[in-house]
Amino acid sequence: MSNTLVLVLNCGSSSLKFAILDATNGDEKISGLAECFGLENARIKWKLRGEKHEASLGAFSAHREAVEYIVNKILVNEPELKGQLIAIGHRIVHGGEKFTHSVIIDDAVLKGIEDCASLAPLHNPAHLIGIRAAQASFPSLPQVAVFDTAFHQSMPDRAYIYALPYKLYREHGIRRYGMHGTSHLFVSREAAKALGKDVNDTNVICAHLGNGASVTAVKGGKSVDTSMGLTPLEGLVMGTRCGDLDPSIIYHLVHQLGYTLDEVNNLMNKQSGLLGISELTNDCRGIEEGYAEGHKGATLALEIFCYRLAKYIASYTVPLGRLDAIVFTGGIGENSDLIREKVLNLLEIFKFEVDSERNKAARFGNQGVITKEGSPIAMVIPTNEEWVIAEDSLRLVNK
């Protein structure tokens, strides 16, 4: 049997998600999370054959130690799994305009990822550390980079050019790039299957809702507009990010209130969104609990979150012309029947009718349509970015 297993690595600034999948069918052999990098309680958790495991990585461990643990402590006891690995696939948040599709990693690709680091300062440097750690531990296996931004490279210039002096784009690449592309690609493709349509003739609006959140208009299988911009800060209200605001607020904070630019950046990225509005938490589950208990801040945060999302969804009918379905995905999108119902009720102009039983059933990994028969379609599709990364890795290695 030919080898089809891919180790997928998703390196964050203080964590590393990993999984080994069969790229042909998405079958997950092992999955895990290494977290708390740089702290005394750095640890790793993984699931193998239905059993959960946890271990300490050692105080102040980080990406390299995590990859070494995967190789020397976990896979050393799984020679069959390790022997069937054909590639290592890496999720890369930002590829700028340099990368319009997935690529096998070489020195030029590493340089390109590094050049894009200013556009994703928390993510791209961590990706590079993870790639180098994987290269050291798996010197004979090809490494593949799969970019979150690549799916959005099909956007027309009217969607990605900001109304700033054009030379800022021409000389410095300042434009909309978008994120979560791998997720939007997967769920839009799965939506076409669920609708029984050819992906090239399917128009959907995908809402990837997690601590980071974005909406994408997908026309005929291609991204034609998306809510995140130059960076992941633009667009929807998120866990700790503000999303859209009047840019003059930055000027006001600096010149009238005495903030430094670094403080403003931290405020908008880490102190705003659901956390900032509610003054309670960035976790949507906590927001929903507060809402149920009548907490004013949580209620306001939830209402603003849903209102902003509904406005974006409505606006994305413009580039589509015809809407076949709204697709909810991501941790919040897949599990919050409350938010889905609120958003669809705000879109009453489109005559969505939520089926309460279907909506409640479509949680915890369950896929399904959540609107009534005869109503315009809204559905939940659990995302699987790891499978897309594994598929692309296998395809490139077999080229």
Curated annotation (Swiss-Prot):
Task: Fetch the InterPro entries from UniProt.
Answer: Ac/propionate_kinase, Aliphatic_acid_kin_short-chain, Aliphatic_acid_kinase_CS, ATPase_NBD
> Binding of Mg(2+): at which residues?
N10, E385
- UniProt site positions, description: Transition state stabilizer: H180, R241
Q: Which GO terms describe its cellular component?
A: cytosol
The cellular location(s) given in this protein's UniProt record come to: Cytoplasm
Q: Which SUPFAM superfamilies match?
A: Actin-like ATPase domain
Q: Which cofactors go with this protein?
A: Mg(2+); Mn(2+)
Tell me which residues bind ATP.
K17, H208, L209, G210, N211, G212, D283, C284, R285, G331, I332, G333, E334, N335
Binding-site positions, substrate: R91
Write down how the cofactor binds this protein: Mg(2+). Can also accept Mn(2+).
List the active site: D148 (proton donor/acceptor)
Enzyme Commission code = 2.7.2.1
Q: Which reaction does it catalyse?
A: acetate + ATP = acetyl phosphate + ADP
Q: Pfam families annotated for this entry? A: Acetate_kinase (PF00871)
| First-level EC class | transferase
Identify the keywords attached in UniProt to this record, alphabetized: ATP-binding, Cytoplasm, Kinase, Magnesium, Metal-binding, Nucleotide-binding, Transferase
Gene Ontology molecular function terms on file: acetate kinase activity; ATP binding; magnesium ion binding
A GO BP term here is: acetyl-CoA biosynthetic process
* Pathway annotation from the record: Metabolic intermediate biosynthesis; acetyl-CoA biosynthesis; acetyl-CoA from acetate: step 1/2
Q: Which family does it belong to?
A: Belongs to the acetokinase family.
Classification via NCBIfam families: ackA (TIGR00016)
Query: What's the subunit arrangement here?
Result: Homodimer.
Name the job this protein performs.
Catalyzes the formation of acetyl phosphate from acetate and ATP. Can also catalyze the reverse reaction.
The entry's protein name is Acetate kinase
Ranked from the top, the taxonomy reads: Bacteria, Pseudomonadati, Pseudomonadota, Gammaproteobacteria, Alteromonadales
